[in-house]
UniProtKB/Swiss-Prot annotation:
A motif ('KMSKS' region) lies at residues 521-525. The gene is valS. Its EC number is 6.1.1.9. ATP binds at residue 524. It catalyses: tRNA(Val) + L-valine + ATP = L-valyl-tRNA(Val) + AMP + diphosphate. This is Valine--tRNA ligase. Pfam families: Anticodon_1, DUF5915, tRNA-synt_1. It comes from the Archaea. Its main location: cytoplasm. Keywords: Aminoacyl-tRNA synthetase, ATP-binding, Cytoplasm, Ligase, Nucleotide-binding, Protein biosynthesis. It is an enzyme of class 6 (ligase). PROSITE patterns: AA_TRNA_LIGASE_I. It comes from Methanosarcina mazei (strain ATCC BAA-159 / DSM 3647 / Goe1 / Go1 / JCM 11833 / OCM 88). Belongs to the class-I aminoacyl-tRNA synthetase family. ValS type 2 subfamily.
Amino acid sequence: MTESEIPKEYNANEVEKKWMEKWNLSMYHFNWGEDTRPQYIIDTPPPYPTGNFHIGNALNWCYIDFVARYKRMRGYNVMFPQGWDCHGLPTEVKVEETHGITKNQVPRAEFRRMCRELTAGNIDKMRQTMLRLGFSVDWSNEFVTMEPSYFVKTQKSFVRMYNNGHIYHEDHPVNWCPRCETAIAFAEVEYDQGQTKLNFVHFDKVDIATTRPELMAACVAVAVNPEDERYSQYIGKEIEVPLFGQKVTLIADEAVEPEFGTGAVMICTFGDKQDVRWWAKYGLPLIKAIDKQGRMTKAAGKYEGMSIPECRQAVISDLRDAGFLYNQKPLEQNVGLCWRCDTPIEILSEPQWFVKINHEGILKAADEINWYPEYMKVRLQNWTGTMEWDWCISRQRIFATPIPIWYCKKCGEVMIAEESWLPIDPNENVPKKACACGSTEFEPETDVLDTWMDSSITALHVSGWESEHDLRLPAQIRPQGHDIIRTWAFYTILRSLALEGKRPWDSIVINGMVLGPDGHKMSKSLGNVISPEEVTTQYSADAFRQWGAVGGSTGSDVMFRWKDVVSASRFLQKMWSIYRFSMSHLKDFDPADAENFPPDSLYTIDRWLLSKLNRLVESTTKELDGYQFDSTFKAIRGFAWEVLADNYLELVKGRLYGENKEGRKAAQYVLYTTTRTLSLLLAPFIPFFAEEMYSRFDSASVHTRAWPAVNESLMSEEAEAAGEMIKDITGEVRRYKSDLGMALNAPLKKIEIYNTQIDTGDIAGATNSEVELMEGAPSFDYVPVEVKPNMGILGPRFRKDAGAIVKALKAEDPASVEAQIASGRITVTVNGEKIELEPEAVEIRKEVISGGREVDVLDIKGAVVVIVR
């Protein structure tokens, strides 16, 4: 192969397009029937099909792909499936926006059709982005949660958990979004710091402070701290609520903070979670003052039909007019918002379906899982410890997995579908048997399942649960963002334990969020959003993947910086130049000769490079086993650029272009071994570039080849030390030439090396000079040859006379001036006047004489290098 046959410039887009068309994606397929190789199943995150595979998705999939490609090369039977989490609120909202409707304005089946159509189109768009980024997805194991083949498993899991007592139906307070008109889980509530007012109100015996005066209609008690002497006489007494007139009891509870407001608070149904605790603890009545649309109910009296903000202002006005409101103070508070639409949530009591939380089981399973990084486990532990309510899994939406339940119209009993009936929509199908009471008339469950009920069985699904395959649980790894530890990770562990009694995975790798170039979270409003397509179009997929690899360690947030992508693109060109140069010298090298190349034919610098190469293989293997992508790729890039290109190639050019056939063949063997190994090491990270490199070594894909093995016989600290000496000597000689303005290939009369025994051939070739190893120690005479005045001292002190002093100094005998410096004072005569100078005012330049020759001495640790002029 000649250098001219390989293009000088690396055209990334052309190469990437070529391999996208050529690759046979079946090489990424998981073999369900094989047990000879260890399995490596990845519980891939199924993103919402929004149509936009955003940069945060792309970063996470880079991590997943690094692992998948690496594990295949390590001999694992890898499954890298791709799923799509279709159901849920985002899709419904988008359909409503697109068609200018609300979900209740069209038939249920028609609305579901619109959602499916939008979702299918979005999946196609996102799939193309994933292919463009070179992700080695096993598309034969793709799953789509809106398809019956998947949601039948969601329904089966519901049926089994219900029958096993893990799921129940109950009228219970839940978080409610009035805008979306659905219950939401605590994990879906986001909090924002906001400004409100604390209102001070006269009740008939005590004064209370509240931020929710609109809930006075739902006041069912007043609470004070039992240690608060201000109110001890009223504990157990009835108090009348102003404006609304109901009588409530004043109770004592330790949870009341005497220092807050007046020290007396309303208990309403429901203003916050604390109200729910007190309501349950004291068996208080339930008054529903707010409906599902966020409007005041009949219980609010004349305020019925008002929105919550309207009612709040009206009540405050009426309290003020009646003399009950006597003060208001500004207050900062955390407001719970719907994760999707940012509407303030309410707590309503509605019949809902719940999953029981097994706190101890989840924490025990979390301890059995390897966390990368380890500290991320604390987030799950903290969340589990704060869970007070069970998981509300019913949603008042349409586009989601139907709950396979009917209610008997005669006796009200629940009829749950049998597994053989699934998949089923109770709104379109009736039960296939009568109720125990004999009735055949049923009311279908119109609520649907929380989308996390779909995605929390992904580990089970990809492991073969309820399929024709044997169950392979646990999966080996779950890669995900830290923002969904309390949802996806938590719910998946819960469900795997409930359904199979096993942890879902062996390990979990957490990635951070992607920040914009300005360091802030990417958002359209800030104008700092970067799309993966923008990067691949301007640079390349491999450049983008490099940014993903080196941008940060697992668990940390990663800032997107264009300069990192530019650096990545430059590395591709640099690596291509290294590869092109190496291949141009391998046209007459037979790869078969590399199989049993005699190690005693290698030069010191050859052994140095091969030892470093094998240490690189050893370290990258260890780092990738620990999912340390940043340190791994930086090490590979540093080796290629600094060790191989900047040093080894410069040192062996003399052999490559010279007449010494044996020396040239040794260098060829090293180049062949190193470039081929680098193509394998780079394959998980920059698959297109690595494939292009490897294609000139082998007709098979690099992605079907084995990861390099460490050759311990080539690892030698002695060889590395000797090689470092050769590298350092050559580098110092090249710097010496540069300082003198000489061309780097300009010959020197002679280079003498003392105090070490090393190969000199490569030094001679790299410096284009005669090199001789010398025995013994050199002797040097340092002869003063020039007086160099220090104008930094003389100028400011003598000003206009400085020039004359400089001239006089230069006329002095350098040896005489050196002797005066040793005495501590220099005297010089200028225009008949003697002037005394401090030693710092001059410098003596000396020539080094060795054996009667003028020489220069280079300072190198472990050796003395003499340059004969």
